[in-house]
Amino acid sequence: MGQALRRLLKSGEAMTPISELMLFEAARAQLVQQVIRPFLDEGGVVIADRYTSSTMAYQGYGRGLDRELIERLDREATGGLKPDLTVFLDLPVEVALARKGGGPGDNFDDAPLDFHRRIHRGYSALAASDPKSWLVLDGQLPPEEISRQIWARVQTII
């Protein structure tokens, strides 16, 4: 389901914010039920590049949808499964967009600069609200230093 959603986003087809939210939640519910939970039940460790915090940042802060609604839908979609650690590589919005490059984007990549600023504020607010489960790093540090700091934190968890 996630792959189909990615194709839809890359198609450039206009989508209402609430439709976008519901599609992400449906894809997440399926992923958690079919892949993540069974893997965790077998003792596995899951590393994901997007989860509920991304939905809150993009749909809540970026698109302006009701954050309480997003929290409720996230809880339903995940069965309350939360990450032990969320890493936020904090970069100025302009730097992050420049790093993305000029290749083909999706509905998010092609959004106005203010949209990306709202998302950045969202991630910052989420990290500040739960500092024990977030690791905020300067995304302009050398990659080796970023890796070192992430690994040091991960080792305290696994």
Regions found by a protein language model. Give the residues of each.
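Arginine/glycine-rich "motif VI" loop of SF2 helicases in the C-terminal RecA-like domain
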Residues: 78-80, 128-129
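Structural signal for conserved beta-strand scaffold positions within catalytic alpha/beta enzyme cores
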Residues: 72, 88, 136-138
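Conserved phosphate-donor/acceptor-positioning beta-strand/loop module used by diverse small-molecule
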Residues: 48-50, 79-100
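ATP-dependent small-molecule kinase phosphotransfer cores
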Residues: 1-78
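NTP-dependent small-molecule kinase module
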Residues: 94-158
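A generic structural signal for alpha->beta connector loops
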Residues: 43-44, 83, 131-134
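Alpha-helix N-cap/helix-start motif at coil-to-helix transitions, marked by capping-box chemistry
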Residues: 3, 90-91, 117
